[in-house]
Regions:
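Short alpha-helical hairpin
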Residues: 1-6
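His-Asp-centered metal-binding catalytic motifs of divalent-metal-dependent phosphohydrolases/nucleases
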Residues: 25, 41-71, 81-91
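Divalent metal-dependent phosphate-bond-processing catalytic cores, especially two-metal-ion Mg2+/Mn2+ enzymes
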Residues: 10-38, 50, 76, 95-96, ...
């Protein structure tokens, strides 16, 4: 049984393509979970699988924040919520959206999650919307094409591209570029 199977009810709230993407991101994270501390492996895989759940629970329109808040309301731990709220350079997206980055403080943790953040970014940036494996450059171009040149998401990708490219190169790619 996969984590995707365990969270099928939650994932069913997403569009079918996003379900496939989310399950594959979780599967990829699980395949390299040995790169993070044993105590974080479960949280890593859960967060990777549920990283886009905020698209189904819109409050602010910023899916990373909406997802973390939803998961917190469902009783998920702070590590999972932190990994969701900060996945794939989301602090840059918050800035582009005009959201004060202090919102991330509600999910602060007292442990080092850098390796787990890197794994999720790598898995997310190398997984297509339908769950296939892609090069990170293809993924970024696809996102911008899907949203269009005037979209906030396109502006976010433009600003975050160096970080996302680095993250997509390996499961331990740097989100600190």
């Amino acid at each position: 049984m996969t984590v995707g199977d365990l969270y099928r009810d939650l994932l069913s709230e997403l569009l079918p393509q996003r379900q496939a993407h989310s399950c594959e991101v979780g599967r990829k994270a699980e395949s390299v979970a040995g790169l993070v501390s044993p105590s974080l492996r479960g949280d890593l895989v859960v967060a990777a699988t549920l990283h886009d759940i905020g698209y189904a629970h819109k409050q602010t329109g910023f899916h990373a924040l909406d997802g973390a808040r939803f998961l917190a309301s469902m009783g998920f731990g702070t590590n999972v919520c932190n990994l969701v709220v900060q996945h794939s350079a989301s602090q840059i997206e918050a800035e582009v959206r005009g959201i004060n980055v202090n919102v991330f403080k509600e999910f602060e943790v007292g442990v080092d999650l850098d390796a787990a953040h890197s794994v999720i970014a790598w898995a997310d940036m190398t997984t297509s919307p339908t769950g296939g494996t892609v090069m990170v450059e293809e993924r970024l171009d696809e996102i911008q094409s899907r949203y269009g040149p005037e979209a906030l998401v396109t502006a976010f990708i433009d600003r975050a591209r160096p970080r996302l490219l680095a993250a997509g190169q390996s499961p331990m790619g740097s989100m600190r570029v």
